[in-house]
Amino acid sequence: MTVTGTRIRGGSTPSPVITIGSEQIKQEGFTDLGEVIRSVPQNFSGGQNPGVVVGATLGSGGIANQNFAGGSALNLRGLGPDATLTLLNGRRLSYGGFAQAVDISAIPVEAVDRIEIVPDGASAIYGSDAVGGVGNVILKRDYEGVTVGARYGGATEGGLGTREYNVTAGTVWSSGGLIATYKNTSADPVYARQRDYADDMFDPTTLYPGSDLHSGLVSLHQSIGDSVEFQLDAFRTRRRQDTYPHNTRLSRSYYRIAAESATSLISPSVQIYLAGDWTLSIDGSWSRDEGTQDQSQVDIATGTRATVFHSCSCNHAFSYAIGAEGPLFSLPGGDARLAVGAGARRNAFVQSNDLTGTNYADGDESSRFAYAEFSLPLVGQGSGFAGVRRLELTAAVRGEDHDSFGRVTTPKLGLVYGPTDDFTLKASWGKSFKAPTLFQLYQTQNAALDSASYYGGVGYGPDAAILSVSGGNPNLDAERATTWTVSSAFHPEALPGLEAELTWFDIDYTDRVVQPITDYAHALGNPRYAQFIDYSPTAQGIGGVLDSADAFYNFTGKPYDPGDVAAIVYGQYVNVARQRIKGVDLSPSYRFDLQSGRLTIRGSATWLDSSQQNGVAQSAYDIAGTIFNPAKVKGRLGAVWGQGRFVASAFVNYTSGVTDTVNKRKTASFTTVDTTLHYATGSHGGALSGLDFALSVQNLFNRSPPLYAAASLDAPPYDSTNYSAIGRFLSFSVSKHW
């Protein structure tokens, strides 16, 4: 069995692993993987999630911190959806949109065996993007029979009427197995008029989009003789959503954005079992994500609609790899094992405006990689002694060569130490990196000429003009991070149902890509921006900016004269930001039997502290605990009780308040309660055999999100990255298995 976070079969990872199995998903009433990851305290709901609305771009995620197509992306530690790697059965998926997010909710949860999340840097194992960590969706391998199901639900305050239909079928034979599933989920929007704290916003502004999702998946495994196994994973999804943003009461029209995304994946692999317990693996993956946005302006008086913008963001990915894993020699704790491999990837991205026939970004990136990982079990069961019951060392290294920025090497060292059978201590140190997104590299560059006063200039002559450049930067380097993780797990033999783990983590994330000029109106003379402004431009420097620009805009009202250029403002993407992230995770669980059934108490919580510095001349500022950024404290605690065919669960979710950085006021915290009741008739051969009923209530007490003073009339008065406007949501589902 392969564990996420290591390529060693049956190996241990020195990093904590969060495992959420299909049974837990069912017990807690989750119906898609988006709901699952939003329940994980280590994950930030900002970035690409359906409830994120206008205004969230003020957070550290910038333009990536908004909802484009209704998907849900992992965003561990709030480092961004492009800094968490998402895998399906251990293999990469195509990026979605220009923010390089992967929509995990498009994978049908009915086919999922478990999701494993490693909230620790893992570039030494998986390469680029695994800075905040990695999430691996593992599909069910053996499924027998057919299950059909339906779910209906809605918010009691109005909106989000949901209709879901799914079918899953599978079979197992002596040498293999197959599972296939299809799901259709449609949901109505939540309008601002349906929530009293937002009903003064322009109608029909939406707080939560309406959507329609079709998703299908097939997974096959087949043994060929005794030494070869073939596996194929494939899925296809299509999601449509309607959003009504950016509308104010002062307008005579409103905007409608109709978005559609289509994702495809084909991922074959071959495992060859060699002599001496060695395994050779050959795998490939092809995936594509095409997202379109049609923005139209609707006249209120006449109802006529005119398309003002139509874009396509298309991502294509292809990869192949070959690897080997097996034992090297014997140690007192077991076999020392080695995993080695190499491969290549190619990603391509195009963002175009179909109305004008122009591209906003167009580029591709290829990379080559090689890796090695060692596991050295020095002491194990049967070979331990007083004070050392278990001792294992791990080491991994990976090298990648990218077309744009060249080579990068990421090592990782780990220790697993068990002083007694009741305690396990883990520690890891490693380097991670993230390649710049293709949008950051290849977005078109725009040059603009305007008066010095426009940029806040004082004392300039009447003819003085300022030349600015913004957009992509093909000379970007990789973002790099150093990560430390130390955890202590308590699993006493005297209480076999008790488990608890406490983790400390620290991330030093440098060379983050940002747009350095955030306030163009006060750029000139501001010491924070001095390193990005050339106050003595040469003719060569001016010509270089214009030669590299894809478009030039003259807003001075006068003919362009290079002699009038008094300064150049460089506002394109650049590697200058540094983030410091540290915190503590806690995850206890206790399972015990009662006369009335089995009770399981489990929970998870995190405390996060993070800051960011944009350039050496600028001061660091807080990220965690500020509006549109991760809250400092998040937690989820609850209980599951089961007796026979009946299961009930109740969980409390807590998110601490965040500070509005404009008026320095802190919002209230947000506490909700989720409950789920399940009843299964069991398999007894009758007409009611194989039925499963579930009633779920999210936000049982209908808590409204904490409010703040929104910066504009078209923004809702709450932080949509941390808090939800849905309110109480009731759903009922039924399924039957043959």
PLM feature segments, named:
Residues 72-75, 103-108, 129-150, 165:
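N-terminal periplasmic accessory domains that precede
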Residues 508-510, 609-612, 653, 657-659, ...:
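C-terminal beta-signal and adjacent terminal beta-strands/loops
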Residues 46, 142-145, 158, 174-175, ...:
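Short loop/turn motifs that connect adjacent beta-strands in outer-membrane beta-barrel proteins
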Residues 1-26, 34:
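Short, acidic, small-residue-rich periplasmic hinge/interaction motif at the N-terminus
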Residues 38-91:
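Extracytoplasmic beta-strand/coil segments of soluble accessory domains associated
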Residues 91-119:
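Short acidic/polar hinge/loop motifs at secondary-structure boundaries
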Residues 144-147, 157-279, 284-286, 391-394:
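Transmembrane beta-barrel wall of Gram-negative outer-membrane proteins
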Residues 601-685, 701:
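C-terminal beta-barrel architecture of Gram-negative outer-membrane proteins
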